[in-house]
Curated annotation (Swiss-Prot):
Monomer (37LRP) and homodimer (67LR). Component of the small ribosomal subunit. Mature ribosomes consist of a small (40S) and a large (60S) subunit. The 40S subunit contains about 33 different proteins and 1 molecule of RNA (18S). The 60S subunit contains about 49 different proteins and 3 molecules of RNA (28S, 5.8S and 5S). Interacts with rps21. Interacts with several laminins including at least lamb1. Interacts with mdk. It is found in: Cell membrane; Cytoplasm; Nucleus. InterPro entries: Ribosomal_uS2, Ribosomal_uS2_C, Ribosomal_uS2_CS, Ribosomal_uS2_euk, Ribosomal_uS2_euk/arc, Ribosomal_uS2_flav_dom_sf, Ribosomal_uS2_vert. It holds the Pfam family Ribosomal_S2. The gene is rpsa. This protein appears to have acquired a second function as a laminin receptor specifically in the vertebrate lineage. CDD domains: RPS2 (cd01425). HAMAP family: Ribosomal_S2_euk, Ribosomal_S2_laminin_receptor. It comes from Danio rerio (Zebrafish). This is Small ribosomal subunit protein uS2. Residues 161-180, 205-229, 242-308 are annotated as: Laminin-binding. One of its GO terms (cellular component) is plasma membrane. The modification N-acetylserine is found at S2.
Amino acid sequence: MSGGLDVLQMKEEDVLKFLAAGTHLGGTNLDFQMEQYVYKRKSDGVYIINLKKTWEKLLLAARAIVAIENPADVCVISSRNTGQRAVLKFASATGSTTFAGRFTPGTFTNQIQAAFREPRLLIVTDPRADHQPLTEASYVNIPTIALCNTDSPLRYVDIAIPCNNKGPHSVGLMWWMLAREVLRMRGTISREHPWEVMPDLYFYRDPEEIEKEEQAAAEKAVGKEEFQGEWTAPVPDFNQPEVADWSEGVQVPSVPIQQFPAGIEAPGKPAPAEVYAEDWSAQPATEDWSAAPTAQAGDWGGATADWS
């Protein structure tokens, strides 16, 4: 399909991108119409897609897209979330019409509804998931292009691009490659210089991962603001007057001293220790615990045995 032109040949960096994204890895099942695009089969049952044929069909699809005079007449569809971001980026780069998400049945056949469209070319991400637009395109004679895996049905598909249409990196890379070739054939960008748009912008990103990355970035920014100041000790002020006596200027309240008459001890003074001293070892041991308690030696306010 490259026509023997060296400028249209697949470059080494393109092959490395295909291998890194896993575009050559097919499924474990094989459709009889996809046998011509399979190179070999691995020991674990996974089919390997021939990347040379992938590149040739990619160029053929790009030539079909460029042949449409009005870019808005090209309709790109992806019902699976792994290709929705890619088709939106492709539509913004090439000016085509996109349907990201659920395809409303009757868009190509029911002229009554407001969303009725008459495109001249249809591009889908997965023939199995996007079977409804493919079927409607066959009713109104719209040529179709599809990214097909080894187990994809090729019914109503005019140009099948063999690739891995399950992985998010492979799907994003294929749409990026297709957009780049379309812009090159239109003359928008040069083949001598690399395209400034990175393939990462076409990759699907999980919303949970995006939320985690934003949260981590916010925490990092907060921590950076906290430690942004300089760690310097406060400079002492030597111009303050020197204080010699710290008690000056402090008002101490005068407390009157209470006098007690002679013979009366001040409250709070403890009694002599010998008054309360008692020899506990001098008392005999009590054998009969049921007997009435004996009077104690100390004066505790009267020794009585009647506790009632």
